[in-house]
Amino acid sequence: MELSELISEIRSFEGIKRKRFISPLVKRFLFDNSRVIASFGEDAAVIDFGEEVLLLAADGIWDKLMKADPEWAGYCAVLVNIHDIAAMGGEPVAMVDVLSVSSAEKCLRVSRGIQKAVEKFGVPVVGGHVHPDTSYDALDIAILGKAKKNSLILSSTAEKGDLLIYAVDLHGRIHPSFPFNWDSTTLRSSDELKKQIECMKILGENRLVTAGKDVSNSGLLGTIGMLLETSVKGAVVNLESIPKPEEISLSHWLKVYPGMGFILTAKDENADEILKIFQRVKMRAEVIGFIQEEWKLEVEFKGEKRVLFSFPEDSVTGLRGSRC
């Protein structure tokens, strides 16, 4: 595939385009509060709580996934929330959910998926709300986490000259129900998953990264774009350096939600230690690019370089840190 064709495919990817609704909505909710350290644009809001911070996040499941496989949707709703907290260098504490279903059968399938994920990750659902008789099926989960204030990882603090590192668990499969979901976590034990999740906490506590984010359903490049928007920085990404399963094409992989995947920025002197930390928990981590001052995301492939996003004209979410 030619680079120009790949760029066109990524720009038109629905997982990226649907993020553009965020910024106009957020403008209605901006206000000052002395206890809020960071909010919109981060994977979780950060609330001052003495020597610690509370982390608060929420995710709703894409209706396409709910229609394709309600049980997998329930599982993923837990998975994505836990990763939002982990990406901040935090520890997940508990979740609440809002479930709307059109039938008892759908309710059973979704709740079965939630139960499997709760058992797998050890983070409880402690309350919520259910609509048992709606004309639609929807699931939203909110999560509370915590972190030490001095070990917090934000996505809005990347710096010029930082290396860009991608860490992902390649031991998995494309989920049979949804072509844009990579499933590694159901193939791992609870102990293995706990160690993988704790990597981000270790990185935060040792101040090894300057910024970080979990890779979302906007895919790897969409997620990098969001990190660059919030940091008001640019990047150059070498597409041939991106770790991926051999059996999956690059164009497909770049649109996949990887399940256990994080994008990080770090100083050169910390890169080797970061790679080793992920390798110890059976994750693949590679340097795939670097941060630049010029506010655009450039991609390199087979000796050619092109601009994927030029900010702010191009936009993923339109958010800059806790501002928009």
Locate each region found by the language model.
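N-terminal glycine-rich phosphate/pyrophosphate-binding loops that anchor nucleotide-derived ligands
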Residues: M1-A87, V123, S151, E159-L164, ...
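Active-site-proximal betaalpha loop/short-helix elements
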Residues: K17, S102, D191-G259
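Glycine-rich anion-binding loops of enzyme active sites
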Residues: L54-L56, I61-D63, E91-S177, F290, ...
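Small-aliphatic-rich amphipathic alpha-helix that forms the alpha element of a beta-alpha
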Residues: D69-V96, R109-K120, Q196-I202, L220-M226
